[in-house]
């Protein structure tokens, strides 16, 4: 991929979880198409130009740096990733502080204080007045727990690792994070057997001091089968929207994308809403654009096997009322398009 393409994606804050070349191309196509759909003039001549050269954010590091997440605020931000050299026991979580123009500040730091097992799938969110939340899943396989840690505006961790619930809770995976307008954070995750069926999705509100502001609460209403892969986004009035995958809501062969709106203290403001057409859907992401929500997901083409996975998208108001039909975002159809993210 050309350097200019990578710079375009960085400027649009499109972050890639998988490192295959095809996912880079798919996300680039989706980003350009999605952007063209939300600008006020659909006929505008939108051109993207690089504003610098590609550079190594961390310098040369030992091992593999994977699963990068990036968050920037008015005072800079952090990039966070998992690698196999940060701690001596499998994967650890490392972070690099970034200034307001994207330059690295200092050297990478280790985020996790607990070392047992693998620490994976990190996310980071900036506190408006400075500081950040980090969240990840850690522990031995089959005994994962969601961990989090808070750093203050001086870049100092205010505590050791915290558990989203308790160290003896059931299996917890697939953490997601968003910082609300009041500076508190929503942590969401997938748990096992906690909703009376198989997998479910839960969340908890965490304060800037690292202390929980609520008990954990259930995101999903529909319990049959698996509810998993939740993503959350902050809303302008202080609450948040959550989306996730729900097995077999529309029929016994469907994998559905659903969503729900919550207040800033975790109280549901709507029922669950099925967001995607009936079919095989996966890995939703959600973003706020103005006063609308854009939801994108991977959708399996059941009619033409050579095309396989596409990127679908749809827009909604802040109560999850649809503003458009679902549409395919990618121009390239043959093969798999996957691992999209948007900001």
What would you call each of these model-derived segments?
Residues 1-24:
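N-terminal secretory signal peptides that target proteins for export/translocation
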Residues 28-41:
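Bacterial N-terminal signal peptides
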Residues 45-343:
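Extracellular, repeat-based ectodomains that mediate carbohydrate processing or recognition
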Residues 8-10, 16, 29, 88, ...:
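N-terminal compositionally biased or targeting/leader segments
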Residues 24-28, 100:
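Alpha-helical and His/Cys-centered functional microenvironments
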């Amino acid at each position: 991929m050309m350097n200019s393409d990578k710079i375009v994606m960085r400027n649009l804050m499109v972050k890639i979880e998988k490192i295959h070349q095809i996912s880079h191309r798919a996300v680039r196509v989706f980003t350009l198409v999605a952007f063209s759909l939300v600008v006020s003039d659909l006929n505008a001549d939108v051109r993207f130009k690089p504003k610098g050269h590609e550079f190594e954010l961390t310098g040369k590091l030992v091992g593999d740096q994977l699963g990068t997440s990036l968050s920037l605020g008015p005072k800079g931000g952090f990039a966070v990733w998992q690698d196999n050299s940060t701690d001596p026991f499998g994967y650890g979580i490392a972070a690099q502080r970034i200034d307001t123009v994207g330059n690295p500040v200092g050297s990478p730091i280790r985020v996790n204080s607990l070392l047992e097992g693998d620490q994976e799938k990190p996310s980071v969110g900036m506190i408006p007045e400075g500081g950040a939340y980090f969240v990840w899943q850690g522990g031995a396989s089959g005994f994962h727990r969601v961990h989090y840690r808070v750093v203050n505006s001086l870049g100092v961790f205010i505590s050791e690792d915290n558990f989203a619930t308790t160290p003896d809770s059931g299996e917890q995976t697939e953490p997601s994070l968003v910082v609300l307008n009041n500076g508190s954070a929503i942590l969401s995750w997938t748990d096992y057997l906690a909703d009376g069926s198989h997998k479910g999705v839960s969340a908890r509100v965490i304060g800037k001091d690292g202390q929980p502001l609520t008990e954990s609460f259930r995101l999903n209403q529909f319990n049959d089968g698996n509810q998993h892969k939740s993503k959350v986004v902050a809303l302008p009035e202080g609450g948040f929207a959550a989306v996730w995958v729900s097995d077999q809501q529309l029929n016994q062969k469907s994998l559905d994308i659903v969503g729900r709106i919550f207040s800033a203290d975790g109280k549901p403001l709507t029922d669950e809403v099925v967001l995607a057409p009936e079919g095989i859907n996966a890995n939703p992401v959600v973003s706020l654009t103005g006063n609308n929500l854009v939801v994108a997901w991977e959708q399996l083409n059941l009619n033409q096997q050579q095309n396989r996975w596409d990127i679908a998208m749809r827009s909604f108001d802040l109560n999850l009322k649809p503003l458009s039909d679902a549409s395919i975002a990618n121009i390239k159809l043959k093969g798999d398009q996957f691992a999209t993210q948007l900001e």
